Amino acid sequence: MAFLHFDNRFIRELPGDPLTLNQPRQVHAAFWSAVTPAPVPQPQLIASSAEVAALLGISLAELQQPAWVAALSGNGLLDGMSPFATCYGGHQFGNWAGQLGDGRAISLGELIHNDLRWELQLKGAGVTPYSRRGDGKAVLRSSIREFLCSEAMFHLGVPTTRALSLVLTGEQIWRDMFYDGNPQQEPGAIVCRVAPSFIRFGHFQLPAMRGESDLLNQLIDFTIDRDFPHLSAQPATVRRGVWFSEVCITTAKLMVEWTRVGFVHGVMNTDNMSILGLTIDYGPYGWVDNFDLNWTPNTTDAEGLRYCFGRQPAIARWNLERLAEALGTVMTDHAILAQGIEMFDETFAQEMAAMLAAKLGWQQWLPEDSELVNRLFDLLQQAEVDMTLFFRRLALVDVSAPDLTVLADAFYRDDLFCQHQPAFTQWLTNYSQRVLSEGVLPAERAARMNQVNPVYVLRNYLAQQVIDAAEQGNYQPIAELLEVLRQPYTEQSGKEAYAQKRPDWARHKPGCSMLSCSS
């Protein structure tokens, strides 16, 4: 086995929990607790990511060795690993929830390879002091979704945590999938997720809310030093402000990327916001099928729609304001925090305009384009048009003689296609004139559009089909779907089934259109 260089700075440099009592409790004056993953009876590695293994300097053959399977299942540790769970708080659905923490995530350590730092974290490896009423476990259903989505997002070009492995534990876990009083046993599983840092907004909020100023100052300085080393040259008087602005900028860019691919996170609580601007915590997420700004995959949010597709940027801004409030308890220059929020607004507006221009095949965004785009969004929503298919097919339109039938298979209902055909035809005419005004060659326009409009996304029903197969003991579809998702912008021969709009049977099927936080 290759030598592994672990450098566990988080637990070496930040205060830890002096108690070793591994049961749910309040933890004060500490950012982490030492924990031991719970052993599992029959660990089986059923999926892995070659790209993530390469980041860590590990081969897939090594991952399959007993020592690695033991480490990835919580049954053993490799030299240098020192498992811990972290303490943080957060706002959940707009309300302060107090201490939350890693309730079933256990970090194994920080691995250094090619001068890059990667924290390895097991999700579903047992109880920690932050588990509250949970069992610290995860089921196969949610673990497959996290594994696939982590890698799908990366290949789409969306900032994200990664997934190294998916291990079946051999356990049966009780879960009430829709919190309706009908619990069932499901297979247990563990995902090893990987990121340069798993620090969240909530890590800063909890000490601020508790008045632990020294602790908060330590975390701010540690985060800048470890995770933002390029800011070390900044004068100490402005370093924190520049850092917060960078957090605001990366968060704004993330929201634009989510919008571009039609991703809905489902539970954008402040404890689910990465300080690095990564997509983190894949729970009741979903991909937009028929375009709907009010759509949420999360049953818990079905009435309030707080975290629906169209509100994600505003929620990200709200979350940044809560982070600014926390930082403001130890940063006297509140104006510089306000500047960070302004940077979010400016960055989001600029990046959103550039992204929409790219999706529509324009070389640049013009102020008058807003009217054309808003009209398109209205039509897409009213006519129940598949977002992914529509934008991909739009590149095929001959703008010198626009024909709506090129886009017909993106519509879910023939009656709505007929009803909205005149309005769509008029929009397509206006769109074509806008494209022609730039004088771009058709092939050049199509190539540019195809770089940002994917053919393949992790549609909810595709994930559910893989889950159904895995629960019957067939794990090959996981690898097959992952292989397709590795090249989301390239038409792949024989893979047409992965590029179809949602079938009728999946419209209201649990796991395809409705999800919960149960995992």
Curated annotation (Swiss-Prot):
Its cofactor is Mg(2+); Mn(2+). Mg(2+) binds at residues 272, 281. ATP binds at residues 101, 103-104, 123, 135-136, 193, 200, 281. GO terms for molecular function: AMPylase activity; ATP binding; magnesium ion binding. It is an enzyme of class 2 (transferase). The active site is at residue 271. Its EC number is 2.7.7.-, 2.7.7.108. Keywords: ATP-binding, Magnesium, Manganese, Metal-binding, Nucleotide-binding, Nucleotidyltransferase, Transferase. It comes from the Bacteria. It catalyses: L-seryl-[protein] + ATP = 3-O-(5'-adenylyl)-L-seryl-[protein] + diphosphate; L-threonyl-[protein] + ATP = 3-O-(5'-adenylyl)-L-threonyl-[protein] + diphosphate; L-tyrosyl-[protein] + ATP = O-(5'-adenylyl)-L-tyrosyl-[protein] + diphosphate; L-histidyl-[protein] + UTP = N(tele)-(5'-uridylyl)-L-histidyl-[protein] + diphosphate. InterPro entries: SelO. HAMAP family: YdiU_SelO. PANTHER family: PROTEIN ADENYLYLTRANSFERASE SELO, MITOCHONDRIAL (PTHR32057:SF14). Belongs to the SELO family. Nucleotidyltransferase involved in the post-translational modification of proteins. It can catalyze the addition of adenosine monophosphate (AMP) or uridine monophosphate (UMP) to a protein, resulting in modifications known as AMPylation and UMPylation. This is Protein nucleotidyltransferase YdiU. It comes from Tolumonas auensis (strain DSM 9187 / NBRC 110442 / TA 4).
